[in-house]
């Protein structure tokens, strides 16, 4: 047995060493369900274009598609008196230095919330290392993971010795599907869904995006670890057939080192399997940073719509009878609730908040309140201690700005 293990290790080391000098990244998920490939295509004598492909059980999911980011660091470079010739596209003159394959990961962990108490995290991983040879010291890594649930990749900027700031102005990532693919689209959260051919998606649509392929496969395009980035949507390419391009809501100013959100491509034989495999998103999100999580108690919530004491008492009774742990007062429990003139420290007269909260405690039902962004920005420091004093157990922030990088980090 020891000899067999030694031989296997020797073979693995040999493969990894060889892969380190390769210009192409090929990766397969632990059970061979998903496969991904990244490589550069020479477009001209001075231009390299990064492309990738994704397969599911040997069938094409995403055909040859562009990958990368567009940066505009000219202002910073001029401020440092650096004379660098700006390529038409920042990715054009990057060259692959190496491809390194990491050890396989196979573990389980317990989330604070979700559909399952135990999540299986198993994947194979590799990183492609690129750099510019023009004296600029720019580097970019493409980190790739292959799960049986899907493929994930992100762009990582190692720390730059001079250009502290990077300005990302465009996401070049594309998704090319076979002719006949259709997507179930929505232009904003909670918008009506519209089934459109890929070429007919003329306005940016939300992610997660579900795509139905002519070969019978179902695909989901989504992302993870997005709290330090702007909103990114999908739209049909104006120049390439059956291809979706990425649309950033705003530029993103970053300080290296820095990792972008994970891009996720899931494929399945049935659409329901995409939902069953959604643990991939939690696996790609960063671990919880809160040490003491005993106070976090996930659960269902029911909205009380009358904003009256009597209505709240009745709703709490219903929640208690049906094992719903929380009740929500949405807008209009303070007024005016959509204006800077609103005061979230004062409850409307028809609602006896202390009585309702006390009754909820008797019944084991916690009370949540909605607070508009106007009041949050104006009263945050005094409001949260006050709500805690009242016995409110949670706050739903309402109508917050979210699309730009600034508001995503807020």
Language model features with spans:
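Bacterial Sec-dependent N-terminal signal peptides
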Residues: 1-23
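An acidic- and aromatic-residue-enriched active-site/binding cleft used to recognize and process polar
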Residues: 41, 147, 160, 180, ...
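Conserved, mostly hydrophobic/aromatic
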Residues: 155, 319, 398
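An acidic-aromatic substrate-binding cleft motif
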Residues: 255-326
